[in-house]
Every structure is written in structure tokens, then in C-alpha cells.
């Protein structure tokens, strides 16, 4: 039997966004299971009401009053789909905390997410932005995204191609942002650890010795903590920006003018380090 949804009016969201803003939702509910989504869909269509999905509440600046329904995705659970000598496939509920998920995968000997440690938010929000950090993007590790389609009223899996992942972009963010509710994400992770250390700051932090996944995770957490305060102590929206991508020709011109320019080769040209650019402008912090 599907658990009924509980709707609350004039619900304060201050504890549910990382800025701690005292926003008030016109209506609020929590989704504990994908089985509740047809009822949610019906409720919204009956009232012709806008929907705001809420995960961990980062990358979000809320108005004082949020019209319509705010639905917080709280779907939990881990399901081991496949295990071989080389890899595992795990399906994880959209409401699981992202950082806790990364820590747990490393503890269980499943590798590939450690460079994405300490990114705020939930598992279900991660594909929307195609989160990435220190040489790894989510799309490198995803094999399916489980969704509820508000257009058809059906639940289905989308493969990575269907998700239209781009640089900090996806189907869910810019192409059809109001069509799907992500209910779970399936990852393909390695059983043997191979470190991804292209990011110079990470290499410097770890040195030249052989490293473990836990050491990479710890180093990433240390670097991120130096750059950004803990939202539990100082409210912030998290770290989100795009490194500008320029042509090889423009990169060569810029490198001539600014020999210390930090950039990385990219399939479409060169990716300039936004952090370095911000620092050079005197705007760090």
C-alpha cells in the first residue's frame, strides 16, 4: 500500500536550504517513495500548480515566498544490481546525501566517485548539473537515471545518451527542466582503484607516493574546505561556476599575454581555470 502524501501549508524552508533563508513555501510535501509520484502528479494537475523540487537545498537562492508546491525528494536506499571482478553497478535513491554516498562507496571498495567528495546536495540532484570536480564528471560514472515522467505519468530509466550530459548541463537542467523527477541513479564503479590526479592541486596535496582512494577523498575534502566555509556555520549556496572554454587560437593569444594562465586541454579547445581568473581579478573569497 502506497503511503499517502502529507501536504503542509505555509511551510518554513530555512532548515532546508544551505543559505538558511527564511523562505516560506505555499505548500510543502516530502516524497519517500517513487510510488507516491502518481498521486503527487494528480494533485498538481488538479490545481494547475507550479512544482519546485528540493534536494539538499544548495545552488539555490529562495524568494521570501515560494508559490505552488515544494516537494523534497527523500527517497533512500541502495541496491546492488551487478557485481563482477572488475566493477559493480549500484542503484542509489535520489534522496541520499551526495557526500555520504561517496564516503560509503569508498568504504565498501567501490571506486570512481572519490574526486567528487564534499559536493553539497543529494544523489538525485547530481545528474541535473552533471556535477564535476578535480578531473571527474558524474557522466563518467552513471549508467542509468531512473525518472518519473510528468508528461506521460510513467517511470522509466534514461541511459547516459538520453540524459544529454554536457559541461555542467543535462536534459534535466536546460532541455526539459520541468518534465522529469529523478528517483534514483545507477552508477558503474570499479573494484580496482585507479587514481585520477590530473588536477595539479590534488597531485601537490598527495605527493608522488602511491595513494589510496581514502587518501584522495581526504585530500579533496581538505582542498574544498579551504576554499569554501561549511554551510552549517556560514550560509552559502555551495561552489558552482563554469570554467570558460576557449578555442586553441584564443588560448595561445591569452597565454602569450598571461604566461601564468592556468588551463586544461578540452575536446572543444581549452578550459580556463575560473578559480585562477577570479583570483587574478582580486575577487577571491
Where are these regions (language model features)?
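Phosphate/pyrophosphate- and phosphate-bearing ligand-binding catalytic cores of soluble enzymes
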Residues: 8-9, 15-18, 60, 155-285
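Anion-binding (especially nucleotide phosphate/pyrophosphate-binding) glycine-rich loop
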Residues: 2-145, 149-151
